[in-house]
Amino acid sequence: MSLPTVLRQAPLVAALVLAGGQAHAAADSLNLFTEGEGLQALNLQELADASGYDTAQIDTWLRGGTYALRSGGTPRAWHYDAAAGILYFAAERHETEHTARNAHRLYRGVADAGPMWVVQGPGPATGSPGVFGERLVLEEDQVYAPWSSRDPEAHYWFWDYVYAGTSKDRLRLPLALPDPVAGGCGIQPRLRVHLQGSSDLSTDVDHQVLGILNPDGNGPSASVAFDAFAAQVLDIPFSSDALAASGNELELVSEPRPGVSRSLQRLDRIEVEYCRQMRAEDGQLWVRQAGPGVVTVAGLPGLEIAVIQDPGQPTAVWRKDLTVAPDGAEGYQVSFDAPATADYLIAHLGAAHTPATEVDDPSDLTSAANAADYLIIAPKAEMQAAAEALAAHRAADGLIVKIAWLQDVYDEFSLGRTSPLAIRTFLETALTWNRVPTYVVFLGRGTLNHKGRPDHFPGESLIPVRMASGPWGLFPSDNRYCDTNGDGIPEFACGRIPAETDVEALAYVEKLAAYESATIGDWMDLMIGVADDADPVSGDFPGDAAVSEALVSSLGYSVNARHFTGAGLTQFQDALKAAWNQGAALSAYWGHGGYDRWGAENFLPLADIAGLSNAPRLPIAAGLTCYAGNDSYPGFAALAAAMVVNPDGGAIATWMPTHQSLNAGAVTLGDHFLELLAGDKLTVGEAAAEAKARALVDDVPAWELDLFEVAGDPAVRLP
């Protein structure tokens, strides 16, 4: 089977294209990033610092209403307090597995929705705080468990778990429900508990979970049964008087099913609808579906109060027809007339949040006129110097190079919001370019904690991972970015340079340049073949290695075979490191593995990789094993990534799996990969793509194709 057409294009004239990288004196468009919901504020100096325009010019434009604001594809009205020099707007909550930030674009031009209408006048007589139907999402991401789902788009971070048949068969959780009140509010109060089945030990239904609201008070309860690795919602309706003023709890009980000794369920999140008093929390309150009539909100810390009718909409109204009075609890309350049922945002001005700002440089990634052989996707703030150095290096080889800054990808394909799907959609669009890229480089590490959860090593993940599904759950797969039609075969030669910093990435570019200009030596015709001892269940690893090594030998390479026999571990480790430090063009491994090792006995441990000093005599390393390419665990480096980012040695590129593989499929993939690399002299990215195409014909399952990915530059060749 021939390589996909887009991988066979020859370069045109060398060129370097920086997408969105041009210098500018001032910016007419800003990205504003918010977390949570509520009132946002930017003063003139903050806008000037972000945009490069002076405060007087921005003040003139704001007074003239010549700015527009959009979020989620919808125009949003804003309010400018000219006396204070502050721009206000309402932000809605946007939270996914990958981000807690919503994105807004503030730009000059034809206004889709300009400033809010302002309603002046006296307010109504003050009243008592009202009641409304609140909808809250309670969620804590405490632990990741991608093996618990089979849906690649599902959540894989969870709050907690219950486990029937163990001492952890019940769980009691506090419910943070501000100001609940008894009585009606026009809704049916209920809890929706989102659960994920995490075991499959029965041919019948595996799971049954009982939920009890306020179990010490004999509160309402409900149960649900479901199977295997399914997601399920436990629905618990209740009456308003079932909630206490504070201290509400939910108990979950994992109940044993007939014939099932143990069953595991994970808690994702809890959605709560209840009747809530109109009392601000932290100086703000978003009241949903209030009115008609007088609305009163208490609990505000001061007299400077904003009320926005229809917040976050193009028809939003800034209300000044208010009555403010003490609320009798050392705070203030505001009353206003609601002419119709609507949402209202009430906030003390001092409680407004300040959004993060970033210049929104123009980009044209959707244009069919684009042309590139080599496409770099990189986060500009973290990787600009390295991206431009890598681009210059490949442009010097005669390739047309384009950098697509990650935020530009989000701006054009996911409304500015962080989303792996935006990257996939962008690459689909790149297939329509005048010159379709052969190579795609993801410049930056990706982990399961791209959201930046504070207790799980935030800041490591620069480009989010995309998940694939296999027999043992979910696993990270850059192949699901580059395989745009879902057949398991990528349309591009893809690789990820798993650096966490610009400095680390620049060191890799220097390592790459030294490798590609290395002095000719015997190492360039050498392969190190490494094999685990045979496993009667998993595979004859030495036998598989011998067949593949014979193939590589027939292609003109000497083979230094290092096959572990189960004895003499220390000597084997020392000999392998010594051979590696002598240098080789190619290395391959057959056997058991983990994210941090080759061999169940750990004869090539992660801890040894930093000590390898074989640069520039660097191999392309293939790991026909399990997990060794999975660099997605927060706080832990993978063996493959460590080889690539070691500036003094290791490997120039690797091809290893991110999860558990089947030996037969791994061997088939490996044989094709080695033949294409050493025989056809393809680049590592091209060899990886074509190996998957050939393996699919050989009946290797598509999920196993998603496992293997390139760490390093996909345009690397054997010397």
Predicted segments — roles?
Residues 1-2, 17, 270:
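Intrinsic disorder/low-complexity segments
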Residues 5-6, 19-21:
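Intrinsic low-complexity/disordered segments
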Residues 1-11:
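Bacterial N-terminal signal peptides that target proteins for export
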Residues 25-719:
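Cysteine-dependent hydrolase recognition
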